[in-house]
C-alpha cells in the first residue's frame, strides 16, 4: 500500500514538473529548462507503466493523489494561499463530479456513436475517430 501511494506521488510530481518547467521556460526565458522538462515527462510515462493494474480504481486513486499534489504545489512552490472557498470553487466542482455534464456533453447535434467519435478518448482529452 505504501509503495503504491509513493508511486502515485512520484507520478504526480513528475507530471506537474513536466508541465511547470515549460511554463517557466516561456515566462522566464530559461532554455535549459526544456531538458529537465523532457526528462520529467519521460519519468512520468515510465512511472505509469509501473502501476499494479490498469483499472478504473487505480486511475481514480491516482487522480485524487494528483489533485492533492497540485494543491500542495500551489501552496508551497507557487506560494498561493489556499482558502476553503478557493478549494470548493470551480476545481472543487470538477473533483466532486458536478461539472461532468458540461465537460462530457456531445457537441451540437452529435450523439456519441452517431458522430463517429469514440467517447472513451474524452478521458484524456483526445477523442479518436472510428473507421466506418
Swiss-Prot record:
Q: Which residues form a coiled coil?
A: none
Q: Where are the transmembrane segments?
A: 5-25, 32-52, 60-80
User: InterPro entries per the record?
Assistant: UPF0060
Q: How does it sit in the membrane?
A: Multi-pass membrane protein
Mention any one GO cellular component term assigned to this protein in its UniProt record. Answer: plasma membrane
- Presence of keyword Ion transport: no
Pfam families recorded for this chain?
UPF0060
- Cellular compartments annotated: Cell inner membrane
**Which keywords accompany this UniProt record?**
Cell inner membrane, Cell membrane, Membrane, Transmembrane, Transmembrane helix
The entry's family comment says: Belongs to the UPF0060 family.
Which PANTHER family does the record cross-reference, listed alphabetically?
UPF0060 MEMBRANE PROTEIN YNFA
Report what the protein is called.
UPF0060 membrane protein SG1469
Native species of this protein? Sodalis glossinidius (strain morsitans)
Amino acid at each position: 500500500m505504501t509503495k503504491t501511494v509513493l508511486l502515485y506521488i512520484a507520478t504526480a510530481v513528475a507530471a506537474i514538473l513536466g508541465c511547470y518547467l515549460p511554463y517557466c521556460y516561456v515566462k522566464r526565458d530559461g532554455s535549459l529548462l526544456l531538458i529537465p522538462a523532457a526528462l520529467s515527462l519521460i519519468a512520468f510515462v515510465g512511472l505509469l507503466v509501473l502501476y499494479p493494474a490498469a483499472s478504473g480504481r487505480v486511475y481514480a486513486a491516482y487522480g485524487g493523489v494528483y489533485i492533492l499534489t497540485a494543491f500542495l504545489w500551489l501552496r508551497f512552490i507557487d506560494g498561493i494561499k489556499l482558502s476553503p472557498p478557493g478549494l470548493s470553487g470551480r476545481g472543487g466542482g470538477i473533483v466532486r463530479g458536478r461539472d461532468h455534464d458540461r465537460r462530457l456533453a456531445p457537441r451540437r447535434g452529435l450523439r456519441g456513436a452517431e458522430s463517429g467519435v469514440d467517447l472513451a478518448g474524452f478521458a484524456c482529452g483526445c477523442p479518436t475517430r472510428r473507421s466506418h
